[in-house]
């Protein structure tokens, strides 16, 4: 059986990592959430999710992320992967999303794009939750609104699975995603 590359796309606070953890438990896929890579440089800097990440540090995070994608391409054929990301609605966001799809193509893996959506007020509530302190995740509701207003979200691909995580519990969302590879 060929591997699967799941691509969970959504704004900060939409539950990408939480859904990804449930999906990993259901499928055995490796969870490669965006903070796994970027926190390698964000944490030494002291990023706390409240103060903005300077452009120089974002560039370092992008370099580490690129190395992670390179390693993902080298995975054995029996390894499926779950990537999580917030892709902005601009050329950079589209290019980043394409890089993850390219991993699937290079690995001859099935590509399953999933858009996680949630109302902004619920996202704002979630980003302030204390469990987001474990990683250098955005934790400021005002910054969240600014990011979403300034850069938006990448438009969903045709045929992508759409899940409202404000109305769908994480385990149910993961079950819906896992069902894509059995149908």
Identify the meaning behind each predicted range:
Residues 8:
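Hydrophobic anchor at the beta1->P-loop junction of P-loop NTPases
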Residues 15:
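Conserved glycine(s) of the Walker
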Residues 18:
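Conserved Walker
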Residues 21-70:
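Conserved substrate/cofactor phosphate-moiety recognition/catalytic segment
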Residues 60-115:
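Glycine-rich phosphate-binding loop used to anchor ATP phosphates in small-molecule kinases
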Residues 105-128, 163:
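Conserved phosphate-donor/acceptor-positioning beta-strand/loop module used by diverse small-molecule
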Residues 125, 129-176:
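Small-molecule kinase domains that catalyze NTP-dependent phosphoryl transfer to phosphate-bearing small molecules
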